[in-house]
Structure formats: C-alpha cells, structure tokens
Amino acid sequence: MIRKERAILALEDGTVYRGYAFGYRGETVGEVVFNTSMTGYQEIMTDPSYNGQIVTITYPHVGNYGVAIYDMESNKPYVRGFISREFSGEYSNYRAQQSLEAFMQQYGVVSIQGIDTRALVRRLRSGGVVKGVIAHRSFTHPEDPYGEFTPAEEQIYVQRARDHQDIDGFDMTKEVTTALPYAFPTLRQGKRVVLMDFGIKHTIIERLAEVGIEPIVVPAHTTPAQIMALQPHGLFLSNGPGDPAPLEYAHKTAWEMMGLLPTFGICLGHQILGLAAGGQTFKMKFGHRGGNQPVKNLLTGNVEITSQNHGYAVDLDSIPNGAFVATHVNLNDGTLEGMAHSRYPVFSVQYHPEASPGPHDSRYLFDRFIEEIDAFDGGNGTPIIKANPGRLGV
C-alpha cells in the first residue's frame, strides 16, 4: 500500500478536512471558494482575479492533461492554494510540457486532495465563503510526514484562518497590475485602445487584438491625462481580484473618462464603472465561478451560457439618475450581469466573454466594442441603447 503525506484544510468556522498533500509542500492561507468548471484548471490557477483565494474544483479529477505554457493567463499562478478530490500524477497531452504537480512545485502552489469536496462546496454554498488554511504535515513534521495532525495542531490552523485579513476593503490589484505600460504586438494596424490593468488575462488582450484593436496595457493607477496622452480610440477596464470599493483612484479615473472615449468593462471593470457612476457594490454569499452560468440578454431575449469569476456584484438601483440601464441578468439569482450608459458609449458585463475556460456565446461583445469605437463621433457619443438597441445583441 502506497503511503501518502498527510495534509489538512482548516476553516475559520472550526471545520477541519483531512486529506493528502499535493503540489508544493508548505502552508497557505486565503479565502476558500469553488469553481464548477470541468476543465481549465491551468487558466484558473493563472488568472490574477483569484489572487488571495484558495480554489476548490468541483470536478472530481484534475490534472490528467498536464500543463501547457501557451494556456497560461498570466506569467505565474495567483491562487493561494488548490483543492481537488483527486489530482492526477500522470498526464497525456501532446501540447503539455509538465505535470500539474511539477507546475505547482515550480511556482509554490500548496494543494490538498482526498477530501470530500462535495461536502466542502455544500458548506460554502449554504454558509458563504470562508477563510481557510492548507497545511502539509511534511512541512511541520518532516521527520513524520505520514502521521496525523493532533487536535491541538488543527485548532492552531483554525485560529490562523480566523486571524487572516479579509479581502473586503483591501486593494488587491496592486499585487497584480503591470508596473509599466506596454504595447501588445499585433499583425495589423488597428484602433488604439488603452487597457487599464487591474489583473488582466492574456486571453482578453488576444481577443481584443483579434477584432482589430491595438492594445496598450497600462497600470491600474494611470490617470486620465496619461490615458489621453496616448491618443487612444477607446478605453477598456479589465478584470481583477477582490473588492472594488477601495479602488477609489480607479473610480475617479473611470468617472472623468466617461463620455470621452468608448469604454468597455469586464468583471472588476464592470464594478468600477458602477461605483464611478455613484452606485454601490455588495459581496455575494459564494459568488459565481465556473463556465456554466446562464445569462439573459435583455436587449435580444437570447440566453448565453457564460464563464464567470466574481464574488461581488453591482446594485443597479443604487446608481443615481438612471445613468446605467441593465442589459444582462443572471438567470440563477437575478443579479446584474451587464449594463450600458443611457447617454455615452460605455457598457460592461460582469462575466468573461473571452471564455478561457468556458463557452464562446458572448464573444460578440468584443465586436460590439470595435463597432462603438468606429461609430464614436468625437465626444458626443451616440447612446448605445436608445439609438439602436440591437447593437449589444447578437
């Protein structure tokens, strides 16, 4: 019988799950969330939006197609930890360069397997996300990695989870944004668009380039004057991690830029636009994370299956003067998934139309963005709802 190194997942509510070590041997702490995608573990791990979080994959078997460098969404993993019912030690994929465990060991991703992930997800779904610690026995007891943690040791990790800082009210984009502006290379000349990087995924940049945009990625703290100095045709507000409320510098920039350029926001960028317009955001019980979220396009009546990753949402009713109108809603819980400004060429969605991983139902939004740029009349932007409701449809 093969002996496995012991590990535990200790939650701040006092629950302890006992399993086996995988990946980098050590300890980690973060907010425990779950993702319902059946594939795409590499894209999930390297998505900067997961900064500060320990991700539970609901699909029971993870890692059997290894890791391919071309599928990374950033230059390294940003997850604090990874949880699966079972990780595969072997892989079969002609595109892959290494196994999932080797990748985790290379980048310091502490993981646990062998726990009842169904029970964990039910707990998160009913009680909401919690802080947790993954601890490997070999890290604290290298002389006996196969032994059990004592009840007293488990309680130490429970307390460590409780003491960990909440992500609420904390600016996490400073840990993931680019330090310097850079231009993304394209094969053809197109419309220059400034991409505010709050934790942008590589695939989003690639999708924008595919529709004829020349992306210039800038740091999250970039000012309106610095943006306009680049002489762009449009502005894009990216995805990113954590609570949008403390990003007051971004709210200010989005507010001052509103109406000056056609603007498209995704995920955190969507939330920033809502806050910039005077609205409020709220933390969801367990968020939306996965590739199977149904969203209704209110302009066409069509239903899209979308890829999502967010723990906060915009309260549309809190935005004063009807500045934004709803364009998309989630069919599971009715939360806002998309909105458009009633006067300016500014629109946003809460989900990920680039879908990496996930379905491609919403990629038309990138085409609509370039259409808004082409139609923009130099500052008196045509209303994207009243003038032509179909322009955000399929």
Curated annotation (Swiss-Prot):
It is an enzyme of class 6 (ligase). GO terms for biological process: 'de novo' pyrimidine nucleobase biosynthetic process; 'de novo' UMP biosynthetic process; glutamine metabolic process; L-arginine biosynthetic process. It comes from the Bacteria. It catalyses: hydrogencarbonate + L-glutamine + 2 ATP + H2O = carbamoyl phosphate + L-glutamate + 2 ADP + phosphate + 2 H(+). The keyword Repressor does not apply. Residues 1-188 are annotated as: CPSase. L-glutamine binds at S49, G240, G242, L268, Q271, N309, G311, Y312. The active site is at C267, H352, E354. Keywords: Amino-acid biosynthesis, Arginine biosynthesis, ATP-binding, Glutamine amidotransferase, Ligase, Nucleotide-binding, Pyrimidine biosynthesis. Pfam families: CPSase_sm_chain (PF00988), GATase (PF00117). GO terms for cellular component: carbamoyl-phosphate synthase complex; cytoplasm. Disulfide bonds: none annotated. One of its GO terms (molecular function) is ATP binding. Pathway: Amino-acid biosynthesis; L-arginine biosynthesis; carbamoyl phosphate from bicarbonate: step 1/1; Pyrimidine metabolism; UMP biosynthesis via de novo pathway; (S)-dihydroorotate from bicarbonate: step 1/3. Residues 192-379 form the Glutamine amidotransferase type-1 domain. Its EC number is 6.3.5.5. InterPro entries: Anth_synth/Amidotransfase, CarbamoylP_synth_ssu, CarbamoylP_synth_ssu_N, CarbP_synth_ssu_N_sf, Class_I_gatase-like, CPSase_GATase1, GATASE. PANTHER family: CARBAMOYL-PHOSPHATE SYNTHASE SMALL CHAIN (PTHR43418:SF7), MULTIFUNCTIONAL TRYPTOPHAN BIOSYNTHESIS PROTEIN-RELATED (PTHR43418). Belongs to the CarA family. Composed of two chains; the small (or glutamine) chain promotes the hydrolysis of glutamine to ammonia, which is used by the large (or ammonia) chain to synthesize carbamoyl phosphate. Tetramer of heterodimers (alpha,beta)4. Small subunit of the glutamine-dependent carbamoyl phosphate synthetase (CPSase). CPSase catalyzes the formation of carbamoyl phosphate from the ammonia moiety of glutamine, carbonate, and phosphate donated by ATP, constituting the first step of 2 biosynthetic pathways, one leading to arginine and/or urea and the other to pyrimidine nucleotides. The small subunit (glutamine amidotransferase) binds and cleaves glutamine to supply the large subunit with the substrate ammonia. This is Carbamoyl phosphate synthase small chain. The gene is carA.
